[in-house]
Amino acid sequence: MDKTNTRSSFPLVPIRSLGPRHRERIAKHLLALDGSDRYLRFGYAASDEQINRYAEGLNFERDDIYGIFNRKLELIAMAHVAVGDEPEQAKHAEFGVSVLKAARGRGFGARLFDRAVMHARNEGRDTLFIHALSENTAMLKIARNAGATVERSGSESDAYLKLPAATLATRLTEMVEDQMAEVDYGFKQQAKHFQELVSSIQGD
């Protein structure tokens, strides 16, 4: 049984690949996290300045970054899949995720993990790695449910998920989901612009 697929547990959610033009929204999303959430996400209580530096330093050419937007085009959940610079690190990727409090309980973290697994497989990577605080039980539960091996060392834990090779199904699924996310984002943009137009007319 392929435990790297968690799709049966959660509904399909449009997940969009993020690029440099989303940098400001990424920063806004992370700045909305409170102190405890920042601690769990980064492993330390990141300040606003540190978060802004993190967002500015994102390498969209090397890494994969995904987001889930609500109807207002607010980034309510995002994942960062980081790849090392060295050639020997090309087969491995590290996963990090954050979900705003108001959007929790809907399986967004697991869906983002599932999306990251699929893309990593399609890119020929064989291991997805998670480094988390041991108290970050939600993140570690997602990893365990996907079949990852979790090793605890005091206040920190590492999870390793071995990935099977890509298949025609994973490649086609990723292509379809990318297209669906683009269409969904376009609809939300149009709806937002229409609402802004109506509001401006009513305000005149």
Label the predicted regions.
Residues V81, F113, A148:
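Basic nucleic-acid-binding interfaces
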Residues V99, G105-A120, T127-F129, M139-N145:
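Conserved acetyl-CoA-binding loop-helix of GNAT-fold acetyltransferases
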Residues M1-L12, R121, H131-A132, T137-D204:
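Terminal substrate-recognition subdomain of acyl/acetyltransferases
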Residues G43-K91, L100:
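Acetyl-CoA-dependent GNAT
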Residues F69, G96-G105, L133:
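A short, internal acetyl-CoA/4′-phosphopantetheine-binding micro-motif in the GNAT/acyltransferase core
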Residues P20, K28-Y44:
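Helix-loop element at the rim of GNAT/NAT acetyltransferase active sites that forms part
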Residues V13-R25:
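A short beta-loop-alpha structural element at the N-terminal edge
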